Structures are given as structure tokens and as C-alpha cells.
């Protein structure tokens, strides 16, 4: 199977998101890379489901709470930007202060 660099990046991000999801299900608090991966994954899946950029920007702030991540992580993540493919092309989705 031949994958482009972009496809490899998406696959790696999705895998990291799955790891984060499993750790969260076990009751573990997520670290910085896990939190970013989970939020990014949720945004990419939402785009795939046909949600709009505005919906994703709003929903991106509800993926995680401060209680679900390690101390200091919410302050470290100022914004998360994910390039997603929509029916009308590729767009950049930005979520500012994603963990409240």
C-alpha cells in the first residue's frame, strides 16, 4: 500500500487519537500530545461526517475538560488547527482555547 505523506500524517494522528481515547476510557488523565491528538481526531471525524467548519469550531471546545487532562495542559494548548477535507475542498479548522 502506497500512502502520501499527508495520508501518513492523518493515519498517525488517528492512531494517536485512538490511544488517547483508550487512556481516557481507563480514567487516565491525558498529556499534551494525547489531548491535541484526541481533539484533532474529533475534528477530522466531524468533517468526514459532513459537519460545517462553524459546527466543528464549536464542538472542538467540548471534546475535553480540564479535569480530563494533566495539570497545566489546558494552559499549554492555546489553539488547535486541523486541515480537513470537506465536500467543497480542504479547509483549516481552528479551535481557540479548546480545553476549558
Curated annotation (Swiss-Prot):
Pathway: Nitrogen metabolism; urea degradation; CO(2) and NH(3) from urea (urease route): step 1/1
GO BP annotations, alphabetical order: urea catabolic process
UniProt keyword annotations, A-Z: Cytoplasm, Hydrolase, Virulence
Reaction equation(s) it catalyzes: urea + 2 H2O + H(+) = hydrogencarbonate + 2 NH4(+)
SUPFAM superfamilies: Urease, gamma-subunit (SSF54111)
GO CC terms of this entry: cytoplasm
Protein EC: 3.5.1.5
Location in the cell: Cytoplasm
Protein induction: By urea.
GO molecular function, one term: nickel cation binding
Keyword hit for Transcription: no
Family according to the record: Belongs to the urease gamma subunit family.
Self-association and partners: Probable heterotrimer of UreA (gamma), UreB (beta) and UreC (alpha) subunits. Three heterotrimers associate to form the active enzyme. The trimeric urease interacts with an accessory complex composed of UreD, UreF and UreG, which is required for the assembly of the nickel containing metallocenter of UreC. The UreE protein may also play a direct role in nickel transfer to the urease apoprotein.
Protein name: Urease subunit gamma
Gene that produces this protein: ureA
Amino acid at each position: 500500500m502506497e500512502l502520501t505523506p499527508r495520508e501518513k500524517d492523518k493515519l498517525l494522528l488517528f492512531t494517536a487519537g485512538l490511544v488517547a481515547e483508550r487512556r481516557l476510557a481507563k480514567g487516565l488523565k491525558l498529556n499534551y500530545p494525547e489531548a491535541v491528538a484526541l481533539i484533532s481526531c474529533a475534528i477530522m471525524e466531524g468533517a468526514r461526517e459532513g459537519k460545517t467548519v462553524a459546527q466543528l469550531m464549536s464542538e472542538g471546545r467540548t471534546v475535553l475538560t480540564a479535569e480530563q487532562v494533566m495539570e497545566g495542559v489546558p494552559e499549554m494548548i492555546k489553539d488547535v488547527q486541523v486541515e480537513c477535507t470537506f465536500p467543497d475542498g480542504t479547509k483549516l479548522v481552528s479551535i481557540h482555547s479548546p480545553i476549558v
